[in-house]
């Protein structure tokens, strides 16, 4: 007898369109003619809900990344965090029940765990699977060398573990996250996860490294991240605090060097700088196209 999880997965996949989307227009309606498989060039489109420009761009990036990087033989898949990731799960579901019934999906945090469970996909964890076929994740900002800032959702530790464990790590984002230098559009600073009893010491260390308490525009700079719907600091899924540390452009142009310096501070658990890890980054654009930056330095357009 099929398990409730199998029944849920069949239900979730049965009504989904099984065809690649068009990247000519984000909300175009054209009947599907081709199954979703990795490597498709996205020549056709399917009926999709009309979304605001930014959301449509996120969906385009996510769908293109799944179509090109999640193949039938991939059985262990990492699911990242952020506002683009729900579209990643949608596109994986569109590959159908047969493609997904033998797969296991590893989350980077509570949000992605909930997405996996609600989709009826099989949930696993990285402590069970030290090697992952593909991880697809969002980013707060990506530079032209595929270095990225992550941790706006306080998940950077698990995100980095799943990124390092993956044979292929792919970033998906909208056009606003595509920058020449980190810190250009994401001005809140580098998210740094610290053990709670060390946060004051780490704040002092970061200030000595050049992270200002007040930005030139008068906005708050270096600070312990505070909760918006609760009194007190944000607490990560691992029970730690998050510090946001902005740095000047000249330091952000050398993100790997900055990463190593911050990581050496006692009390720091993980740093939201991801350097030299991504195979490619997919950016959905306002005009319905997708820009792909690859780790070999090439830039292509869909």
Curated annotation (Swiss-Prot):
One of its GO terms (biological process) is D-ribose metabolic process. It catalyses: aldehydo-D-ribose 5-phosphate = D-ribulose 5-phosphate. Pathway: Carbohydrate degradation; pentose phosphate pathway; D-ribose 5-phosphate from D-ribulose 5-phosphate (non-oxidative stage): step 1/1. Gene3D superfamilies: 3.30.70.260, 3.40.50.1360. GO terms for molecular function: ribose-5-phosphate isomerase activity. Transmembrane segments: none annotated. It is an enzyme of class 5 (isomerase). This is Ribose-5-phosphate isomerase. The gene is RKI1.
């Amino acid at each position: 007898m099929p398990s409730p999880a199998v029944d849920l997965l069949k239900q979730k996949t049965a009504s989904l369109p099984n065809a690649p989307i068009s990247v000519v227009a984000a909300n175009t309606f054209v009947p599907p003619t081709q199954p979703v498989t990795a490597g498709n060039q996205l020549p056709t489109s399917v009926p999709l809900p009309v979304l605001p420009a930014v959301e449509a761009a996120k969906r385009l990036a996510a769908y293109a990344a799944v179509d090109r990087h999640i193949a039938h033989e991939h059985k262990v898949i990492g699911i990242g965090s952020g506002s683009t990731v729900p579209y990643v799960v949608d596109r994986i579901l569109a590959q159908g029940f047969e493609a997904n019934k033998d797969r296991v999906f590893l989350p980077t945090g509570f949000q992605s765990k909930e997405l996996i469970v609600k989709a009826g996909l099989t949930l696993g964890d990285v402590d069970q699977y030290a090697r992952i076929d593909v991880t697809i994740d969002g980013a707060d900002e990506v530079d032209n060398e595929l270095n990225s800032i992550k941790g706006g959702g306080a998940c950077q530790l698990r995100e980095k573990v799943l990124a390092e464990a993956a044979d292929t790590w792919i970033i998906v984002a909208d056009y606003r996250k595509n920058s020449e230098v980190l810190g250009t559009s994401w001005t809140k600073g580098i998210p740094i996860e610290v053990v709670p009893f060390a946060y004051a010491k780490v704040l002092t260390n970061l200030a000595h490294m050049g992270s200002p308490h007040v930005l030139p525009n008068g906005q708050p700079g270096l600070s312990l991240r505070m909760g918006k719907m609760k009194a007190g600091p944000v607490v990560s899924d691992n029970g730690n605090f998050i510090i946001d540390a902005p740095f000047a452009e000249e330091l952000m142009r050398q993100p790997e060097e900055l990463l190593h310096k911050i990581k050496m501070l006692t009390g720091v658990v993980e740093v939201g700088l991801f350097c030299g890890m991504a195979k490619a980054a997919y950016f959905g654009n306002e005009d319905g196209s997708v820009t792909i930056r690859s780790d070999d330095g090439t830039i292509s357009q869909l």
